[in-house]
Amino acid sequence: MAYKENYPSKLLEEAVDAISSLPGVGRRSALRLALHLLKQPQENVHHFTAAIDHLRDEVKYCRHCMMISDDDVCSICSDKARDHRTICVVESVRDVMNIENTGQYHGVYHVLGGIISPINGIGPSDLTIRELVARVAGLVSPEALFEAEGQGGAQAEVILALSGDVEGETTSFYIYRQIAQYGVKVSSLARGLGFGDDLEYADELTLGRSIVNRQIFRP
């Protein structure tokens, strides 16, 4: 028998509608959360809603890597101890957080904001690939090469840390074609991750090893 909802309050139903619009939250879970909020002290609920308002209205995106940040430049890009000649390309902010949790990567990032997915109407222009190409071009500018020579002459590297499914591989190949002309090293994660696995669901040990043992990207 189908689950039928009968709400004693229109306001409660509207709250359930809003909460259930979140990914992974069904209507029963949304109802449970809404009823829980009703039991909380008013100041707790105000703190909860204020945090969401501030997140939506005040969070910024780093002008270099597109990571979410409280400032125009995120804490990773502003860290001079990081290797700014190594850029790890990821699909989402969550991927950055997962890689950082491994403690195995010390470069910077570039968040694409998705992957190429024709079936979902997402093309290269819908992602931050153009900004990535500009960053890579900057790595081989005379000024950047002179600075790198003073720091040991390390070759610039782009790590394609995208999922191994068809869409992820398509995106990696497209990016490779866009940046190959600049002569930077292009690598991808070692395939400790299964085909189609997302970084979000990889355990820290497996993900860390995939980064350390990364391989030259073979188009």
What are the language-model segments listed below?
Residues 18, 22, 40, 55-58, ...:
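Conserved, well-folded catalytic cores of nucleic-acid-processing
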Residues 30, 79-162:
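Extended interfacial segments that mediate partner engagement and assembly in macromolecular machines
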Residues 45, 121-122, 168:
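Alpha-helix N-cap/helix-start motif
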